[in-house]
Amino acid sequence: MSAISRREFFKNAATSAAVAGFLSASARMLRADPLGLPIGCQTWPVRTMIAKDFPGTIKQLAQAGFQTIELCSPVGYADSGFAGLGKYTGAELRKILGDAVVTCVSSHFGIEELRKNQAGGIAWAKDVGLTQMIVPSLDGPQKPTMDDVKRAADEYNKMGEEAAKAGIQQGLHNEDFELTMVEGKRTYDLLFKLLDPKLVKFQFQVSTISQGYDAADYFTKYPGRFISMHVQGWSAKTRKTTAVGQDTLDWKRIFTTAKTGGIKNYFVEMNLELMKASVPYLRNLQV
């Protein structure tokens, strides 16, 4: 299957009308049934809104049915709309979340950001009350050697060790470098062997089904190695992103095996209109 990049998933961002529709989701959607986990939202798709009004955006996400969110670091994602988060103290940010009755235990951090100042990233995470620090990619070469993969894993194990000292779980998303091949083997699978299972957990991007990476297969193959997942609907017939429950994915199987994989939280990550349309299905899904 041909690769579908993250940028392609979000290039058709919702219009203001779609935003309005997204924000009008009813209060009856505030409960989630899959594994007893709250319905989560990655804030990347609403980064423009966050840049303009973070407190208002969080309240609106809560009204739409999301009970927990995943942020992006104000340093590593400063150019993407998250720089403004840096103006809040941890107490202020926690109050904004608390007032909206929304929790946040996870955030994305750029690998280069952590290379330059991991201590600063950890300090911000602790101040905000996070327990998970996720890196989207180790940013290795697109045609890596086995040594490239080993070096990347060694470096990230050390970062995981530093995070663990602070009581934070380091995590790794699967994008770009993680989806390459090395000597006929998937780099992603090699990383499961090279990364310390205690120091680094994995966050699965469900949309990588478009590249042949099946979430349920990985949760079963590597029990206990995951901590979270990014949820996107995907139609094999149209090869397009769809609302969860309006696609061809077996979500009952995905969530059932997610328990085996160790999933502690999940975050819907699509354009606003599709995120809104996914909430009722997730609320009613029984596994």
Describe the role of every protein-language-model region:
Residues 2-3, 7-24, 28-40, 47-67, ...:
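Histidine-acidic metal/acid-base catalytic patches
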Residues 13-15, 21, 75, 96, ...:
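Active-site acidic/histidine proton-transfer and metal-coordination neighborhood
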Residues 40-52, 106-115:
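Active-site mouth loops of central-metabolism enzymes
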Residues 41, 71, 107, 135, ...:
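Conserved beta-strand positions
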Residues 54, 83-86, 90, 142-149, ...:
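Flexible, glycine- and charge-enriched loops at secondary-structure boundaries
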Residues 70-92:
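Glycine-rich, proline-tolerant flexible connector loops at the mouths of alpha/beta enzymes
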Residues 77-81, 141-145, 237-241:
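A short acidic, helix-capping loop that chelates divalent metal ions and anchors anionic groups
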